[in-house]
A protein has these predicted regions:
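Structural detector of well-ordered beta-strand residues that form the stable sheet scaffold
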Residues: 120-121, 142, 159, 170
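Catalytic cysteine-centered active loop of the rhodanese-like fold, especially the PTP/DSP P-loop
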Residues: 131-132, 167-168
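Extended, subdomain-level signal for the structured scaffold at the beginning of enzyme domains
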Residues: 2-120, 127-131, 148-150, 158-160, ...
């Protein structure tokens, strides 16, 4: 009987939020640019589009398909010029951030939409686009582990964590961290029960066969090898930030 009551209470909560969101939908804008890391985008999208009342907008400079880092082309649902007012912006990362930092139209759109959004968010190196738009000034933030030393260049201080919240700003770590980040946002907006229900719906219960997904659990040898692999990308990002 107690279990039935709990289920009924949770269903009531979910239905109430759905009703409220139908009256006041939440417009969520995902920002695309060439060579974006697709999981930075698709991970949070898969979670946040399930949030009660969410209306997702996949936005780019033009309606043309946007190439991602893995060969998957992503089709925008709208353009920067035609975007509605956004309650939340989500800026993914990827090696394409380096070129996007030099694209005034992309940075200006992030700046303008972020200034009026209730939630300003990024995944991975998307943090540097928020920073270039002046949206990380004085904020605690995170990004992909290889790039955390560059955060002060865009006015932010690095804070440890899979994802970091500072006021209305949420930043996620690298790539897969965007899924955890999205559940954190959902819990803050809709409550823990809704986040738990969606987590079960997508069966998000990661159990990788290896345990080296964070620098704290990787060997010194592995860290040295991967740090070398990121030398050139980090240098390119530093140069792009410095202009």
């Amino acid at each position: 009987m107690a279990r039935a009551n709990v289920a009924s209470d949770e269903r009531f909560l979910y239905d109430r939020i759905q009703t409220e969101r139908r009256t006041h939908p939440m417009n969520i804008g995902f920002i695309l640019f060439p060579n974006v890391t697709q999981l930075d985008f698709t991970g949070p999208l898969q979670v946040l589009h399930r949030m009660p009342g969410a209306v997702t907008h996949i936005l780019a400079k033009s309606p043309d398909p946007v190439p991602s880092d893995c060969g998957l082309s992503l089709v925008p649902t709208g353009t920067f010029a035609g975007a509605p007012g956004l309650d939340m912006i989500v800026v993914p990362g990827g090696f394409g951030v380096v070129e996007a930092l030099g694209d005034a139209e992309t940075v200006d759109f992030i700046r303008a939409s972020g200034a009026s959004a209730s939630y300003v968010t990024s995944v991975c190196t998307g943090a540097f686009l928020l920073g270039a738009a002046g949206l990380l000034d004085g904020k605690q933030a995170t990004t992909h582990w290889a790039y955390t030393s560059l955060l002060p260049l865009v006015g932010a201080a690095h804070a440890p964590g899979r994802w970091v919240k500072d006021g209305n700003t949420y930043t996620g770590g690298g790539v897969t961290a965007g899924i955890d980040f999205a559940f954190g946002i959902m819990a803050d907006i809709c409550g823990q029960q809704v986040a738990e229900a969606i987590q079960l719906a997508v069966e998000y219960d990661p159990a990788p066969p290896t345990q080296t997904g964070h620098p704290s659990r990787a060997s010194g040898k592995l860290m040295a090898m991967m740090a070398t692999r990121y030398d050139d990308p980090v240098k390119a990002m530093r140069a792009a930030i410095s202009g």
